[in-house]
Regions:
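Positively charged n-region of N-terminal signal peptides that target proteins for export
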Residues: 1-4
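Bacterial N-terminal signal peptides
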Residues: 6-15
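Cys-dependent protein tyrosine phosphatase-like superfamily
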Residues: 14-138, 153-201
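A phosphate-binding catalytic loop at a beta-strand-loop-alpha-helix junction
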Residues: 138-151
Length: 201
C-alpha cells in the first residue's frame, strides 16, 4: 500500500466512532470533553488534523479532496480562520465555493492577530453560533491548526465553562503553543481571572 493510500485509510478511520465518542455540536453538547485524536493525513491537510469527540474536526488547510471526503462522512459546516490574503496567495481553489457546492455551510472568521483581523471575543461568539447551529459534523481550520487551537481553547473556556487547565490541555493536544496572548485577546480578559495554566509565570 502506498503512503498516500495508507493516509487515506487512516483519514477515514477518524470517522469510526467508538462507544466513548461524544457529540459536541448542537444545542445540547456532551458534558464530558473528550481528548483530541490525531492521525497522519498526508495529502489531505497541510498540517495537523484531529477529531474531538464524534463531530468536531480541527486542522490545517484542507485540500479539495479532504473537503469532499469530509462532506461524504457527514461534515456539514466548515469554519475557516485564514485571511483573504492567505487564501489568495496559497490556496489553488475557491474553498468557499467548493464548500457551498457540496451543500455544506461555510463560516468565515478571518483572524491574524493584527488590527485588521484581530483575535476578538466576537470570533468566539461567531464560532459558538456555528457549533450550536450545525446539523452535522464541523471542521474548524486555519493554516496549521495554530489559530484554530487557540480559538478552540477560548471557546471551551468561555462557552463551555471548561476549567482553564483542561481547556488549554485539550487545545495543546491539537497545536496550541504560546497560548496566553491570543487566548486573552479572544476572551478580552486575562487568564488569571479564569485560572492560571500549570507552571506559568
Amino acid at each position: 500500500m502506498t503512503r498516500l493510500a495508507a493516509a487515506a485509510v487512516a483519514f477515514l478511520t477518524l470517522f469510526a466512532v467508538d462507544a466513548a465518542a461524544q457529540k459536541l455540536t448542537g444545542l445540547k453538547p456532551a458534558a464530558v470533553l473528550p481528548a483530541p485524536v490525531a492521525l497522519d493525513t498526508t495529502g489531505m491537510f497541510l498540517a495537523k488534523f484531529a477529531r474531538v469527540g464524534d463531530d468536531v474536526f480541527i486542522g490545517g488547510q484542507p485540500t479539495e479532496r479532504a473537503l469532499r471526503e469530509l462532506q461524504a462522512q457527514g461534515v456539514t459546516t466548515v469554519v475557516n480562520l485564514r485571511t483573504p490574503e492567505e487564501m489568495t496567495r496559497s490556496v489553488s481553489f475557491d474553498e468557499a465555493a467548493l464548500v457551498r457546492s457540496l451543500g455544506m455551510t461555510y463560516v468565515y472568521i478571518p483572524m491574524r492577530g493584527n488590527a485588521e483581523y484581530p483575535y476578538s471575543p466576537a470570533a468566539v461568539t461567531k464560532f459558538a453560533e456555528a457549533m450550536r447551529s450545525t446539523n452535522g459534523k464541523l471542521l474548524l481550520h486555519c493554516t496549521v491548526a495554530w489559530r484554530a487551537s487557540h480559538l478552540w481553547g477560548a471557546y471551551l473556556i468561555k462557552e463551555r465553562g471548561i476549567p482553564i487547565d483542561s481547556a488549554l490541555a485539550n487545545a495543546r493536544a491539537i497545536n496550541l503553543s504560546d497560548e496566553r496572548p491570543p487566548i486573552e485577546q479572544l476572551l478580552d480578559q486575562s487568564l488569571p481571572t479564569f485560572g492560571r495554566p500549570p507552571h506559568s509565570p
